[in-house]
Amino acid sequence: MPNKVHVKKGDTVVVISGKYKGKQGKVLTVLPKDKKVVVEGVNIVKKHVRPNPKMPQGGIITQEAPIWACKVMLVCPKCGKPTRIGHRFIQEGEEERKVRACKKCGEIID
C-alpha cells in the first residue's frame, strides 16, 4: 500500500506544531515514502559540502530540510485559513474525478 501525503507540491501550508509553529510557506518537495515534506523557509539547516565539479570551493550552504507531513496543514486559497481536506467527486463528461475540498468553506482546491 503506497504512503499518501495530504499535501502536494506547490500547496501553501502552515506549520501547526514544533519549533516553526505558525510559519507559512510553499511546499517545495513531497517525500511520500518518508511521509515528509520540504517547506519554503522552514527548518533551515547548514550543510557542509566538499569540493566537487559544481562547487570547486566547497563550503557551507543553507537549505530547507524535510519535516513530518503531519505537522503541516493546508491553507485554503479562498478563505485563507488552515483547514483539513475533504474529498469530492465531480463529473467531467462521462467520468468522475476525485478532487480535494476545504472542510471550512467547501471550496474545491484542485
From Swiss-Prot:
> Molecular function (GO) terms listed?
rRNA binding; structural constituent of ribosome
GO terms in the biological process aspect are: translation
Q: Sum up the protein's function in the record's words.
A: One of two assembly initiator proteins, it binds directly to the 5'-end of the 23S rRNA, where it nucleates assembly of the 50S subunit. One of the proteins that surrounds the polypeptide exit tunnel on the outside of the subunit.
CDD domains membership: KOW_RPL26
Known SMART domains for this protein? KOW
Q: What is this protein called?
A: Large ribosomal subunit protein uL24
Description of how the protein assembles with itself and partners: Part of the 50S ribosomal subunit.
The GO cellular component terms are: ribonucleoprotein complex; ribosome
> What sections of the protein cross the membrane?
none
UniProt lists the family membership as follows: Belongs to the universal ribosomal protein uL24 family.
A Pfam family assignment = ribosomal_L24
Which InterPro entries does the UniProt entry name for this protein? KOW, Rib_uL2_dom2, Ribosomal_uL24, Ribosomal_uL24_CS, Ribosomal_uL24_KOW, Translation_prot_SH3-like_sf
The encoding gene is rplX
Keywords from the named record: Ribonucleoprotein, Ribosomal protein, RNA-binding, rRNA-binding
